[in-house]
C-alpha cells in the first residue's frame, strides 16, 4: 500500500523541522526527527490497522500512531493511508476536529 500526505500534514512536518532546527541549532537533529516520523508513514502504509482507532474521540475512520513526542493522525483508504496531521502529542488533538 501507499501513503499520501494532506496539506496539513506537510505543514506540520515543516513546523516540526523548523522548531527543532531553531531550538537545537542543528539541521541534522531536525532532519533525524522528521526522518523518524516519515519512516513511520511506510510502516503505516504496510500495516494500516496498527494505529489506535479514534472513532469515539475524533472522527469515525481515524487512527493515530505515536512517534516519540509526536502523533500521526491518519485514515485508512482503499489505496493506502492518508496522513492528515502530524502534531506534538501534548497538543489538544481533539481541537483539530472541533467545528
Give the residues covered by each predicted segment:
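Short, hydrophobic secondary-structure boundary micro-motifs
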Residues: 29, 52-54, 95
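Σ70-family region 2.3-2.4 aromatic/basic alpha-helix that recognizes the −10 promoter
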Residues: 38
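Generic beta-structure capping elements
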Residues: 6-8, 19, 47, 86-89
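Short, solvent-exposed helix-to-loop capping segments enriched in aromatics
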Residues: 41-50
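Arg/Lys-rich, positively charged N-terminal/basic patches that mediate binding to nucleic acids
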Residues: 1-35
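Basic/aromatic recognition patch in beta-strand/loop cores that engages polyanionic ligands
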Residues: 49-79
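Enriched for short, Lys/Arg-rich terminal
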Residues: 67-71, 75-99
Amino acid at each position: 500500500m501507499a501513503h499520501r500526505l494532506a496539506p496539513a500534514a506537510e505543514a506540520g512536518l515543516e513546523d516540526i523541522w523548523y522548531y527543532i532546527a531553531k531550538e537545537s541549532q542543528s539541521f541534522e537533529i531536525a532532519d533525524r526527527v522528521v526522518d523518524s516520523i516519515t519512516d513511520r508513514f511506510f510502516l503505516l502504509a504496510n500495516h494500516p490497522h496498527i494505529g489506535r482507532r479514534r472513532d469515539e474521540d475524533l472522527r469515525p475512520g481515524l487512527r493515530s500512531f505515536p512517534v516519540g513526542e509526536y502523533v500521526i493522525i491518519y485514515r485508512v483508504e482503499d489505496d493506502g493511508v492518508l496522513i492528515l496531521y502530524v502534531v506534538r502529542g501534548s497538543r489538544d488533538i481533539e481541537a483539530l476536529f472541533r467545528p
